[in-house]
Regions:
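Generic, well-ordered alpha-helical segments
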Residues: 27, 38, 55-62, 76
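Conserved GNAT-fold acetyl-CoA-binding loop/helix
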Residues: 47-68
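Short alpha-helix boundary/capping motifs
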Residues: 62-64, 74, 139
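A short helix-loop-beta-strand connector motif used in the catalytic cores of GNAT acetyltransferases and
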Residues: 55-56, 68-83
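Acyl-donor (CoA/ACP) binding surface of acyl/acetyltransferases
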Residues: 1-34, 38-48, 81-160
C-alpha cells in the first residue's frame, strides 16, 4: 500500500493520508493562510498551465471561500481536494484534486494537480499522485481516472 489513512487528523483536516515523505489532506478553513501563502509564492510558476485568476483569488479571505466549497463538495462526494504537505517540514507543497466524480455504472473522475516550484523534479508529485490514485481506486472504487493536461506541459505528460 502506498498510503495509510491517518485517523489522528489535525488542524481541522477532513481526511489525511500519509506516504513515505508526504501527508495528503483535505484542509479546513483554518489553513487559509498557509494555502494563500503557497498560491502567492507559486502564482507566476503556475500561470502558464492554470486557469486565470484575478488578484482577489490570492487573498486569505477569498481562499476561505474556496476552502469552504472544497469541504462541502468533499462531504457530498463530489470532490477530493488533497493538499500535499511535506511531512519533514510541514510545508504545503502542492495539491492533487479529483473532480467530476461520477458514480453508478461510470465510477470515474478527473484529476488535476500542481506543485511548488522549489519542490519539482524530486519525485514528490509522483509519490503524491500514485498514493492518491490508489486511494481513489481503493476507497472510492473508481474504474477510470482521467488527467486534464495541456499538451505543452511536458512534465505532466511524463508524470502520467
Amino acid at each position: 500500500m502506498l498510503y495509510d489513512i491517518d485517523t489522528r487528523r489535525t488542524r481541522g483536516e477532513l481526511l489525511a493520508l500519509n506516504t513515505a515523505r508526504l501527508r495528503l489532506a483535505v484542509l479546513g478553513r483554518r489553513e487559509a493562510g498557509r494555502i494563500t501563502e503557497y498560491l502567492v509564492n507559486n502564482r507566476s510558476f503556475h500561470q502558464e498551465f492554470s486557469q486565470t485568476h484575478d488578484d482577489s483569488y490570492f487573498t486569505e479571505s477569498e481562499q476561505k471561500k474556496y476552502i469552504h466549497y472544497d469541504c462541502e463538495s468533499f462531504r457530498f462526494g463530489e470532490l477530493v481536494p488533497l493538499w500535499i504537505i511535506e511531512r519533514e517540514t510541514g510545508l504545503i507543497i502542492g495539491r492533487v484534486s479529483f473532480f467530476n466524480i461520477a458514480y453508478g455504472g461510470m465510477m470515474n473522475c478527473a484529476t488535476g494537480y500542481h506543485l511548488d516550484e522549489a519542490h519539482t523534479s524530486k519525485g514528490f508529485m509522483t509519490e503524491a499522485l500514485k498514493a492518491a490514485v490508489q486511494f481513489m481506486f481503493n476507497e472510492y472504487h473508481m474504474h477510470r481516472i482521467e488527467a486534464f493536461i495541456l499538451p505543452e506541459n511536458r512534465a505532466s505528460l511524463e508524470l502520467v
